[in-house]
Swiss-Prot record:
This is Small ribosomal subunit protein uS14. GO terms for biological process: translation. Zn(2+) binds at C24, C27, C40, C43. HAMAP family: Ribosomal_uS14_2_B.
Length: 61
């Protein structure tokens, strides 16, 4: 789990726009966040496997 102070800091509006960054909505992880879902790769995979993300399915070719 991400540090609570960093999550709170990320929620505040930054002084400059370029300082804003994405965090996972579930765990607060700052790296590897998919913009389409707002989730990190770990939470995205977990939710996709459980079938909680509509339209997402396991690849097979």
């Amino acid at each position: 789990m991400a540090k609570k102070s960093m999550i709170a800091k990320a929620k505040r509006k930054p002084k400059f726009k370029v300082r804003a960054y994405t965090r996972c909505r579930i765990c607060g992880r700052p790296k590897s966040v998919y913009r389409d879902f707002g989730l990190c790769r770990i939470c995205l995979r977990k939710m996709a496997n459980e079938g909680l993300l509509p339209g997402v399915k396991k690849a097979s070719w």
